[in-house]
Structures are given as structure tokens and as C-alpha cells.
């Protein structure tokens, strides 16, 4: 079983968390819906089938993230990453400068959508940008040809600040915005 997409996602989420909150060598719990896990493995399994599929994940990630444990309640799966995993991500993965810059930018008072657009354009990568009128978000931006950052970034201007969420393209499509 190829667990690389799931491991990459866990690492990306931990990096984003560390950009927002700072690094601490501590256990982290990350939650994924069954649908997202099915996207990682290109499957359409139920909870029991996913539990079976994940049996080799701890062995696969042990050298990098430590003894990752997982459990589920219905279609909601929780991954327990030990302190060693948090430390590994902090020390051994390349810096995701873009996510750090984005987190810092949206954390500033007075951040605007123009500031967000400028940050994306500053990367000199080809981006896709579109207005969204779904009540949840105002704008969608993603990198068109970036194989490492494949997320869809969704932004909402709440008047006094900008919030964002990032989704894997398959998860974004599931929302049917």
C-alpha cells in the first residue's frame, strides 16, 4: 500500500500548525474524514475497510514520525502523532516558506485580499484565481503546476480580518461549491 499521500498530508498539516502556533515537541492529534482518506488511496471503502487498509501505516512512518496510532469513531479518523513526529517535521522537512508567509500575512491586522493575491503572485508560479459566491468563501486560489503544493486555498474577508482554509482538490470538489 502506498501511504505517501497520507504521510505528506500529515506533515503539511503539522508544518501549518507549527507556522501558526510555533514548534513544541508534543503529541499531535489530526482528524480526517473517511472521504479524504479514500481520496489518498483512490478507494471507496467503509470504516472497517479503511481500518484494515491503515494497518501498515504505523510501520511505514515509524522511522520518520514515530509510532503513529490511529482510531476512528464512525467516519472520523484520528491520527496520534507522537512528540518525535512533531520534532521530525520541525527538523527534517524542507521549510514551506509559502505557508509560513501566508500564516504571517493573514495574522496581520489590516491584511487585504490584494495582499493575499500579491503573496501568491510573488512566488512567480502560475496560479488560478476565481471569485466564489457560495457564502462560505470569497475567493479560491491555487498553484496550477506545483506538484508539491496542490492545495486549494479558500479565503473569506470577514471585514476585520481574512480567514483561509486549504483543501486537497478532491476534498474541495466533494463540497460541490
Label each region the model flagged:
Residues 111-155, 167:
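A cross-family detector of function-defining hotspots
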